Amino acid sequence: MKAIFIILAILMVTQAFKMTSKVNTKLQSQIQSKFQSKNKLASTFQTSSKLKGECDTIIPDFTGCNANDACPLSFTCSATGNDEQLCNAAGQNVIDMIFAHWSTCWNTYGNCIEFARQTYAIYNAPELCGCDYVDEETWINTLESVCPYV
């Protein structure tokens, strides 16, 4: 009788490890698929080194990121003159920021989306980037697909 309980206990532990392994594998594949979308999105906004070198650095006001020097928004800048190449670079920089600072600046899908919403104002405001090549709805939809959903 005691042997049966030991065998059952071993089977239960083995099954628990298998289930944990399946969950971890599924979670890992979800994360990988979200991060692989960066390659697809890179074609949405052309990369330009011009904007990255010319822009000021500010610190975003996000939960866990207040006064955190590891979280710059390097795409803020004086007006681009609505230059298409500079505006595309601003969009690419947002995508780069999401991936470069995942877990440092935002660690939930919700605050990543909040970042995406705030960045449109920077992209579009005449006194900042001054770009209007992408409307706000398209901007949010594009960046929502970049935010890792974990």
Curated annotation (Swiss-Prot):
Keyword Secreted (UniProt): yes
One GO cellular component term noted in the UniProt record for this chain: extracellular region
InterPro entries: Mating_pheromone_EUPOC
Places the protein is found: Secreted
Main location: secreted
Positions of disulphide bridges: none
Propeptide: 17-52
Name of the molecule in the record: Mating pheromone 1
